[in-house]
Amino acid sequence: MPRRRVIGQRKILPDPKFGSELLAKFVNILMVDGKKSTAESIVYSALETLAQRSGKTELEAFETALENVRPTVEVKSRRVGGSTYQVPVEVRPVRRNALAMRWIVEAARKRGDKSMALRLANELSDAAENKGTAVKKREDVHRMAEANKAFAHYRW
């Protein structure tokens, strides 16, 4: 491994409509085959629907949904003396957001609604109300960490 300087992470530009870096990241995660304008229109239309349902602004509603899906702990495999343990570790803030967004997009893609914008709006509104597939995924991850709390001393 070369011992060169560590290259810093690139800053992503905030999205044009709301000026939010978090939303820009969400658009990038939703984007397929480099079709950013399509992804943006899906996200904006989903946020509009979400805002009408919740009575909050688009960004507030999105932030609430994201907050309810963010995991605080996860398990990582750690090999100790021939056996592999699932060790609970705290999730870094950047990864917390990335996982939450990824889970919301995955859950929305699996839904059976007509358009992707509607699926995304429904998943986000479910997440805002602490229900839905993405929230269930977070609960499963937390349950795994809780079950493997005994191996927490193997943390590195």
From Swiss-Prot:
The keyword Transmembrane helix does not apply. CDD domains: uS7_Bacteria (cd14869). GO terms for biological process: translation. InterPro entries: Ribosomal_uS7, Ribosomal_uS7_bac/org-type, Ribosomal_uS7_CS, Ribosomal_uS7_dom, Ribosomal_uS7_dom_sf. One of its GO terms (molecular function) is structural constituent of ribosome. Keywords: Ribonucleoprotein, Ribosomal protein, RNA-binding, rRNA-binding, tRNA-binding. Transmembrane segments: none annotated. GO terms for cellular component: small ribosomal subunit. The keyword Ribosomal protein applies. It holds the Pfam family Ribosomal_S7. Belongs to the universal ribosomal protein uS7 family. NCBIfam families: rpsG_bact (TIGR01029). One of the primary rRNA binding proteins, it binds directly to 16S rRNA where it nucleates assembly of the head domain of the 30S subunit. Is located at the subunit interface close to the decoding center, probably blocks exit of the E-site tRNA. Part of the 30S ribosomal subunit. Contacts proteins S9 and S11. This is Small ribosomal subunit protein uS7. The lineage of its organism: Bacteria, Pseudomonadati, Pseudomonadota, Gammaproteobacteria, Enterobacterales. The gene is rpsG.
